[in-house]
């Protein structure tokens, strides 16, 4: 079918590369590019020899001319951005310059400000449209599959959706007193920020971890979950017509929250530079350096994740509730691709999103979120590539 360039070599990229190599009919050749080429080479060494040809390269994703030159040299059908969210705009610039479609899993966030929103990337819509290129935003699980679930529910189950609750439960145990399941810097910035939800056409802001609920998750059990701001709230509020409220909840254990509060209290989660022995350092980046690498958690992690969406709305004039979700087993993920389920649930949809664009099933000029395309081929692919979904027509609701 064609070629894909994957930028990044962390846990999510590792899963995506594994999945591309399982799908050689679509991904005939891939280029893995990262600032640290040795990580790319390690993936190539592990997976080389199959039907998917693998190349590697070193690149600084913030160096737009160098990145553009690399894209032009490889001539991929799509660039799959699995680097840091800070680098999204530079990679989009390079794709425009090289004339290549773009896919990512997380929206842009300025490095010096703990704030993420789609406005910066949506502003590229005219440029991608004029270039005849597709930019697919947020093709992970949340955002990503949660948007596809929403589009599927709207297409097949409802005449109108009024309420969406997105529930992200990680019931895994890695044995550490404190560690993050993906990039510590991004994770801690996300959970220490103020929460918010969309209601009646406006944002309602909350203090960090202010709103707590308890929910009994299938195959995981009862967990405490907390309302956070999450990026798909913004796109779903725009794209799911008639929605009155959208909320996002994520589960956290008491040990995690206790450690996080302690680190916040001593200033270790700050992104403001400080002077230390004549050098400028950012406390959060120092913390990231001493915490366990998320990529190392795979062999230690047991348990399951459960991520999904509870919908409330109308069908044929009657009230209706509907729940779509996926349960993923950490140990099974590690046995298959050498990564835990948090990376797996992001890396698989990343590959599927790239496949949707490469095959033309999802392709139109402009910048789009996943819920703006036909959900059916993506939903079918989830069942094929390791993230089978389940549904309930009588879910327990979140108050």
Protein language model annotation of sequence segments:
Residues 9-10:
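Glycine-rich Rossmann-fold phosphate-binding loop(s) that bind the pyrophosphate
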Residues 13-14:
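N-terminal Rossmann-fold NAD(P) dinucleotide-binding loop
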Residues 36-39:
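Helix N-cap at the beta1-alpha1 junction of Rossmann-like dinucleotide-binding domains, i.e.
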Residues 49-63:
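Rossmann-fold cofactor-recognition segment
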Residues 60-76, 83, 87:
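Conserved Rossmann-fold cofactor-binding substructure of NAD(P)-dependent oxidoreductases
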Residues 71, 77-81, 95, 102-103:
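N-terminal Rossmann-like NAD(P) cofactor-binding module of classical short-chain dehydrogenase/reductase
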Residues 106-133:
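Rossmann-fold NAD(P)-binding glycine/threonine-rich loop
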Residues 155-399:
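C-terminal catalytic/substrate-binding lobe primarily of soluble NAD(P)-dependent oxidoreductases
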């Amino acid at each position: 079918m064609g070629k894909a360039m994957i930028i990044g070599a962390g846990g999510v990229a590792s899963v995506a590369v594994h999945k591309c190599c399982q799908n050689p009919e679509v991904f005939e050749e891939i280029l893995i590019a990262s600032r640290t080429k040795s990580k790319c080479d390690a993936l190539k060494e592990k997976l080389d020899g199959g039907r998917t040809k693998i190349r590697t390269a070193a690149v600084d994703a913030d160096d737009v001319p160098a990145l553009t030159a690399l894209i032009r040299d490889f001539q991929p059908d799509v660039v799959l951005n699995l680097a840091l969210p800070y680098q999204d705009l530079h990679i989009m610039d390079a794709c425009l310059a090289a004339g290549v479609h773009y896919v990512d899993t997380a929206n842009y966030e300025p490095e010096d400000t703990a704030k993420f929103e789609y406005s910066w990337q949506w502003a590229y819509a005219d440029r991608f449209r004029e270039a005849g290129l597709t930019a697919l935003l947020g093709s992970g699980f949340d955002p990503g599959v949660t948007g596809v679930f929403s589009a599927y529910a709207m297409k097949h189950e409802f005449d109108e959706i009024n309420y969406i609750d997105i529930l992200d439960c990680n019931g895994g145990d890695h044995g550490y007193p404190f560690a993050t399941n993906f990039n510590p810097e991004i994770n801690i910035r996300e959970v220490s920020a103020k929460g918010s939800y969309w209601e009646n056409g406006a944002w309602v802001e909350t203090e960090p971890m202010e709103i707590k609920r308890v929910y009994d998750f299938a195959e995981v059990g009862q967990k405490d979950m907390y309302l956070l701001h999450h990026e798909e709230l913004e796109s779903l509020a725009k794209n799911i017509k008639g929605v009155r409220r959208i909320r996002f909840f994520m589960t956290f254990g008491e040990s995690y929250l206790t450690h996080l509060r302690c680190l916040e209290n001593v200033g270790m989660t700050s992104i403001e530079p400080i002077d230390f022995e004549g050098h400028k350092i950012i406390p959060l980046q120092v913390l990231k350096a001493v915490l366990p690498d998320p990529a190392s958690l795979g062999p230690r992690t047991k348990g399951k994740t459960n991520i999904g969406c509870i919908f409330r709305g109308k069908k044929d004039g009657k009230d209706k509730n509907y729940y779509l979700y996926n349960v993923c087993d950490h140990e099974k993920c590690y046995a298959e691709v050498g990564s835990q389920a948090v990376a797996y649930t992001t890396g698989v949809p990343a590959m599927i999103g790239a496949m949707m664009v490469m095959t033309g099933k999802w392709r139109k000029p402009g910048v789009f979120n996943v819920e703006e395309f036909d959900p059916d081929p993506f939903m079918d692919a989830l069942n094929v590539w390791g993230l089978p979904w389940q549904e309930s027509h009588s879910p327990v609701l979140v108050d």
